[in-house]
Amino acid sequence: MIDKSGYRANVAIVLLNRQDRVFWGQRKSRTSWQFPQGGVATGETPLQAMYRELYEEVGLRPHDVEVIASTRDWFKYDIPDSLVRSREPVCIGQKQKWFLLRLKTSESNINLEANDSPEFDNWRWVSYWYPINHVVYFKQDVYRRALTYFKEYIN
């Protein structure tokens, strides 16, 4: 769902383990790593989209996690001009509703092949602030904003 300004509605997930380390996924067939994220479908709430993406990308169900917090506002980032597609509707970036979750069940429930088109082919737990400097450059600011927003909920 792309708004009139050219931003695609999206959800992003910060998944914590019991040690407050975060899930960090390597994108399939790429060298880049990121948090789980994905678009909000027409007629879908951000919460519904988050649970759908959580299952599609990480293989976890609602009973596997606790929702700790979500951002009140949508956080935006622009994509580089070289990645903007020329066909309609033009998407210049993403506006994201962020969710902070805690894993309640065993990490053995994480399944990167829960659907037919996996997003990730590898994952690991990393320190809370690690992703800011290791995500693709054009997402660094939005990652910093989200992690700073959620910091008050971390032990």
Curated annotation (Swiss-Prot):
A GO CC term? cytoplasm
The short sequence motif called Nudix box sits at 38-59
Question: Which EC numbers does the record give?
Answer: 3.6.1.-
Origin: domain of life: Bacteria
Q: InterPro entries annotated for this entry?
A: Nudix_hydrolase, NUDIX_hydrolase-like_dom_sf, NUDIX_hydrolase_CS, NUDIX_hydrolase_dom, RppH
**SUPFAM superfamilies in the cross-refs:** Nudix
The Nudix hydrolase domain is annotated at: 6-148
The similarity annotation says: Belongs to the Nudix hydrolase family. RppH subfamily.
NCBIfam families documented for this protein: PRK00714.1-3, PRK00714.1-4, PRK00714.1-5
Q: What does this protein do?
A: Accelerates the degradation of transcripts by removing pyrophosphate from the 5'-end of triphosphorylated RNA, leading to a more labile monophosphorylated state that can stimulate subsequent ribonuclease cleavage.
Query: What name appears for this protein in its UniProt entry?
Result: RNA pyrophosphohydrolase
Q: Which organism is it from?
A: Francisella philomiragia subsp. philomiragia (strain ATCC 25017 / CCUG 19701 / FSC 153 / O#319-036)
